[in-house]
């Protein structure tokens, strides 16, 4: 067995020395730790430079930004966890010096870049184009001060907007955006007093506050959808009083009951627990809906209620208003509470009560199950004021034999009649795209076979006309995907529309171009499709040795396009493509997106498991590594299993060997700087066969996939099978527990924010449609908690104390730790204060990396001692 040579070991010794003491010496009292300097420098470096195309396709906005991070002190600010929501009880007004470090505009037609001025010591944030793309609004921030600027592309100059009172000593909350005429810009800002709506007069270069600082930031704030009608805001009611106090003694028992009706629900977090929580929910979520004009007139609309953000009709004459009302639930979050949907006139008069959805505490446990009754109400985008209503015709239960599953109805202004049936679908409704006055695409889908269909209908007909099948494909089969329409913002209708040829005959599609040839992988393409016949023609496709994707079309005839091009040796850059000649002209010269990993070797590898399923992953080798000199490496596999209904789909390889590969700053890839090889996202497909559910054969397939990956690393001569670690997050943590319990392939594991006992998620998890009582053996055999006595390898458990993810309650890790400890296991359990399912605080993220490197250094890095 080959081991690290002395020269390579010396180069990699520093990171290990920084973690010199055993993990047992590090306790919760040690505080937050930081990884080695080499890793810390990576985490502190700016994000990769990015380029964004303006809506008119004339400009590339090129920016270099800080990596957004939150402090643990910010997470520790007063916070409520109610009805599935997490929110601060006081809006954050502090300005953090974090944002865009530098910005420039590159003309797509050619010419020199135009630098957007960012003052020394400041940052730029929230750039937003005007609707005609002639002006770019952005904010510069300094400690305790924020300033709005407007850049004029014609004059290539920027001017500051003077705020009322001399400046904004607060934090930008949101920017509802530009007026249609480009004369005004709306934004909300949070100061010590609260959150308020502001308007900037661009010509006068002044900004003033329109509302008092009482916007209900918890409920949704303000919206200005069409840039011309009054803005609609949710304000805290006047005289709402102080936060309800917790009673000194309980007023009585907490009672829940069920009267014989089957009501399965998946596990949910942050639920209401008692009447005090109910009072808190009402206190923070109750709002007064108001309209606000640009001259500052505020008009109350309706009564105080728990509102969702209203939606304005395309013609600006009506509001679609949703209110949550009692009875609330202790079983589901706000999304399941009773909700009344109404149409209001712009002055607040109730025009029509559309639907009062009852409390939703249950849903059938089966593939294709959905909510009974009307589940979606929205404005039809191509008409002035018409509602689309989607409802299940089978009560949401796919086990019922019915000719049609879903119905889409329409309700037109003035909303006095009854909703009229528009179209019905044999499978679950999957959306509708209105392409032109005579054509729309109607989608339906079934999870029973994972097949999606698209039908061409005539939206001008009351019944949609006779549907014509356009596409019918398996969504698991990446090679069968028809692609996506290319869109461009339409100023007249104020919405994105599919790009069409000048004669309106052709529509344009792009897609990843998946192939069954793993040597070439994905080959993105540009197609044009004749909607009248479904005829498709390929205009262009990425060709090796490059990997290119279409970013934007520059003309409706698709003669030129902007593409993003890269190769294994050329970093990604933007080019103008002549579609006919296939020639490209460089637009940008972006820097290396991860210079700190420039000497890392990356390769997409493919291999098979014994049942013939093809697998793949991205292999990274650490900086300075030389196989012939340094021998085999300790390796870390980071993965996340996925269910499939066919082996063919499971075998497809995503990505391309022609891509420029640099590790991101994801936690597990930072292990490269500590001397480990990393196999990132090795596929772990769980395939259902011969009518069985995928999870009926979960463990054998999981172990076979992991073993195949290790065998491949050994075959390549880079991985030491005796020094393999494995890890994952969420379902990847669940995978890690199973691999340690059901195999002897790994020296150690790292499991973050996982669920380990499936009896605690008895009404389904991931894509598993069956309940525990329908498939008890499957739940039991898949639960690593049930095999805790078999886990002999060291395992590091990490979990946020406020995990908000369905099914991954912190108690999962608590009980797993207790089970492992009780059975003599080698386990370390790290709880991250205040963190949710994903870790946000700078201190938490750095500590997690420290834990991961330390754990692997102790249990994986060193060669096994042979007696």
Regions found by a protein language model. Name each.
Residues 13-23:
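Bacterial N-terminal signal peptides
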Residues 238, 326, 393-395, 415, ...:
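Short, glycine-/Ser/Thr-/acidic-enriched flexible segments
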Residues 627-630, 636-656:
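Short, surface-exposed "cap/lid" segments of acyl-processing enzymes
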Residues 99-103, 108-110, 638, 642, ...:
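Active-site-proximal cap/loop segments of hydrolase catalytic domains
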Residues 588-631:
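N-terminal cap/lid segment of alpha/beta-hydrolase-fold proteins
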Residues 25-583, 589, 593-599, 651-652, ...:
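Beta-propeller folds
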Residues 341, 387, 470, 574, ...:
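Conserved hydrophobic/aromatic pocket- or pore-lining residues that grip, position, or stack substrates
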Residues 2-14:
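Bacterial N-terminal signal peptides that target proteins for export
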